[in-house]
């Protein structure tokens, strides 16, 4: 899946980045992408993920690749430190976006489960199996 491709590439880049705040943030990014992959395993085309896979993650990977090149040049100056701080902030932002996407997808699942349960309860009551073992139909 697209998510697995990005997890693999981000991990690959992360292994060569010694900056702890960046690596910690990227570990979280990969964990969140794994959760997202699990949630979307059996779902077809989800518009919430289109921007993530078509825009956000490609830009993040591109920024990480450029950062790695700068880091490998061993020239650590104010511009580098400013760029590094911006990258850290961006990783925090993308992780928050991933959490929001995961949360909204779980909300959809909860609504679907509740709708299924409600429908099943109505059908059971209609067919004469209406006694509620928990006493909430009183």
Language-model segments: which ranges?
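Membrane-proximal, non-transmembrane interface segments of integral membrane proteins
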Residues: 1-42, 46
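Long amphipathic all-alpha helical oligomerization modules
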Residues: 38-138
